[in-house]
Amino acid sequence: MLGFLKRFFGSSQERILKKFQKLVDKVNIYDEMLTPLSDDELRNKTAELKQRYQNGESLDSMLPEAYGVVKNVCRRLAGTPVEVSGYHQRWDMVPYDVQILGAIAMHKGFITEMQTGEGKTLTAVMPLYLNALTGKPVHLVTVNDYLAQRDCEWVGSVLRWLGLTTGVLVSGTLLEKRKKIYQCDVVYGTASEFGFDYLRDNSIATRLEEQVGRGYYFAIIDEVDSILIDEARTPLIISGPGEKHNPVYFELKEKVASLVYLQKELCSRIALEARRGLDSFLDVDILPKDKKVLEGISEFCRSLWLVSKGMPLNRVLRRVREHPDLRAMIDKWDVYYHAEQNKEESLERLSELYIIVDEHNNDFELTDKGMQQWVEYAGGSTEEFVMMDMGHEYALIENDETLSPADKINKKIAISEEDTLRKARAHGLRQLLRAQLLMERDVDYIVRDDQIVIIDEHTGRPQPGRRFSEGLHQAIEAKEHVTIRKESQTLATVTLQNFFRLYEKLAGMTGTAITESREFKEIYNLYVLQVPTFKPCLRIDHNDEFYMTEREKYHAIVNEIATIHGKGNPILVGTESVEVSEKLSRILRQNRIEHTVLNAKNHAQEAEIIAGAGKLGAVTVATNMAGRGTDIKLDNEAVIVGGLHVIGTTRHQSRRIDRQLRGRCARLGDPGAAKFFLSFEDRLMRLFASPKLNTLIRHFRPPEGEAMSDPMFNRLIETAQKRVEGRNYTIRKHTLEYDDVMNKQRQAIYAFRHDVLHAESVFDLAKEILCHVSLMVASLVMSDRQFKGWTLPNLEEWITSSFPIALNIEELRQLKDTDSIAEKIAAELIQEFQVRFDHMVEGLSKAGGEELDASAICRDVVRSVMVMHIDEQWRIHLVDMDLLRSEVGLRTVGQKDPLLEFKHESFLLFESLIRDIRITIARHLFRLELTVEPNPRVNNVIPTVATSFHNNVNYGPLELTVVTDSEDQD
């Protein structure tokens, strides 16, 4: 029935395209109508459209004319010189109808899926122009600085011709220049640059003139799937130097390496024993049917199952798994031990290992044997692995009548310090083990200039600004024997998911979005529209070729390269890691095939390498970094011989990455072909392939070196990829649920901070805070509750020491209610603050002379005090929230929902934060003292006095860091 309705009415995509096509026709009519106008008359259209918007006309009604203006300008610019990234080019672009259609969709808030070479960059100019007519901030977000600079210089020339201003944000741009850039009508930049400026404005800037942004109205995100999905779990973090260096990683690294070595030795010994028993069966296609022989083989496979849980990448294990029947036996034992009734037997077998490695979930666990061995290496006892129940420990101390109050306090401090030390050592041990067992050099990171540089798993590009979170980066530094750097302190953080939710309007463009349309809709409320290509795609997509082993696969890839290279076709070979690209490069050198390698180690030459990748006979081996924002243009000879040939060395866990690689060829009607080569040792196949695949392998195994190729295999691989994508989507959604809690708190604090910076009367804000503190004190007076560990008799002493007022609690309790007490306390606090403020102004006036605006300076100092303590308490709160987030998962043991627990406890922490901010500000308002040394150069005195109080806080050198969640490394 649904299929019939689609055939009759068309799919939703077809209906939208048909609706937008009517607007395209109107745009073309306006383009023709504008042709007779002079250049000046056409330029004046911008001012006219702006005025019409100010008069109340909507952008939707002006869209056909505005887009017609842009198209007409593009036509007039044809043949004119444009300098792009230092190269002189000539303008040769006029929007096609499909580009106008995509531009309409972007203005309407869609994500437009446009294939490689279809002109997304030019398409974005039209909605940028239309929305810039409002005078509100309009941003074009790219994936790197090079593309931001290129697009601003290239297509930004259209906007500048029309009288709009454009600016580009790149890393290293100074504050004053950033302010000017943000005043432009259209700003180009990367997601991290926009995000870090948002954080700086709301957590580092202490005066209005230090803030650079002017709001968030409309943004178009280029390669939107990369930014909103691949980078979704990657928070932007501004950090400063931590208080101290954590010695745990240095102290434990050798001991951890020894423990891992023991594990490898154990697994290697078990594997070799099994190999000796299976040697005679590895080269036969069919196993013998004798029952006793099969039982013996099965026992050897049981041993190899144990090896798979301790060293999943053991070479003997991988060799045995090449045989389909032996692979099936190992998998059968895996199913057996996963059954609930066999759990005890499974635990008994696993207890032979030191460490259980869960490759599927990218995790591990120390066994009792491993803990005992660790204790032998590191000293101490197994109790170190048990976290202390602090509530129980404190209760024992309180109930110990032999202890004096002072002894109880000292014992609590000692217990707290021991708990902190245990947690630090346990955390350090876990991260060092993760670095040794799960993080691979030249796959997850590279070592460069005594530093660990993360490799982006989706693009293959190095990310020198990133650090793995939660101490994992330091653990890898310890593993690789480079300098272990200090832990940093988080000053401000936001995820890209929540940053882009700040924009009133959001749109995107990419070549691969439809596979993630559900996520875009559910999380961002963005719909995906597939835009037709200008010319039919001539790419030939060959069926994948499957091989039993990596050895056979690489042999087939080299043969394919040699064959295609002999015909003269340019070839792009896509790999998933630096390690694989260098391995393949070595094989090609051995076969004397000239080629160029592009990976994270030589990414600086990317533009040069890509520029030559489309030439006749070129062979380029590249990681996924060649998949974003780069078009490989063919020379005429390459087109004649059949265009670019793309070879994939494996299937990625995301179908989008595979589509990106395919999309490198056959752009704009050019010829091309793509083929993927896989082995059953590939990570995707090992961890996520369907059991049906193993059955097929056993029945249809070809002779060694021959491939299996059938659409059925392609479908099974796609099913595995969908399974991984679904898993990753669940993780991203789960992460967002937690971050949403933090985001609401962030917005509340930033709004409070904004009010302080923008308040005309900071004195009124101070009075409001004093009133809140008075109400809190009044509540304590009436309730007999404890406050910060003090009972009621200590409260009077605390109040008088914190605030210079004389209060008698017993007299206050004679008043009728809390409000009456609060009013009395507030009146005294405000009166005393007014006296001190006036005294401070008077003293500053005498010291600075008549030319000094003492009142304004004192107000600025009060403002600085408020901002400083908001920032200080917020930083402490971020640490508390991180600890809560890391510990709340354990609540599942008590049958509690971790998310609900997190929401509840984070709310309590936030209430405490607000209280602490108010109390801290109130206390420090009464501690202000300004002294000015006589100085004839009054103009130099003013800024010094106004900022000196806040600058006593040493932030140290700030680090702009994109922190990758260590748990997300698949």
Swiss-Prot record:
What EC class does the entry list?
A: translocase
Q: Which HAMAP family does this chain map to?
A: SecA
Q: Which InterPro entries does the record associate with it?
A: Helicase_ATP-bd (IPR014001), Helicase_C-like (IPR001650), P-loop_NTPase (IPR027417), SecA (IPR000185), SecA_CS (IPR020937), SecA_DEAD (IPR011115), SecA_motor_DEAD (IPR014018), SecA_preprotein_X-link_dom (IPR011130)
Q: Which family does it belong to?
A: Belongs to the SecA family.
Species lineage? Bacteria, Pseudomonadati, Chlamydiota, Chlamydiia, Chlamydiales
**Record has Cell inner membrane as a keyword:** yes
Q: What is this protein called?
A: Protein translocase subunit SecA
Reaction equations catalysed: ATP + H2O + cellular proteinSide 1 = ADP + phosphate + cellular proteinSide 2
Q: How is the subunit organization of this protein annotated in UniProt? A: Monomer and homodimer. Part of the essential Sec protein translocation apparatus which comprises SecA, SecYEG and auxiliary proteins SecDF. Other proteins may also be involved.
Q: Which UniProt keywords apply?
A: ATP-binding, Cell inner membrane, Cell membrane, Cytoplasm, Membrane, Nucleotide-binding, Protein transport, Translocase, Translocation, Transport
Cellular location(s): Cell inner membrane; Cytoplasm
- Origin organism is Chlamydia pneumoniae (Chlamydophila pneumoniae)
Family matches, as NCBIfam families: secA
Q: Extract the PANTHER family matched here.
A: CHLOROPLAST PROTEIN-TRANSPORTING ATPASE, SECA INNER MEMBRANE COMPONENT OF SEC PROTEIN SECRETION SYSTEM
This protein's encoding gene: secA
> Which PROSITE patterns does UniProt cross-reference here?
SECA, SECA_MOTOR_DEAD
**Which cysteines form disulfides?**
none
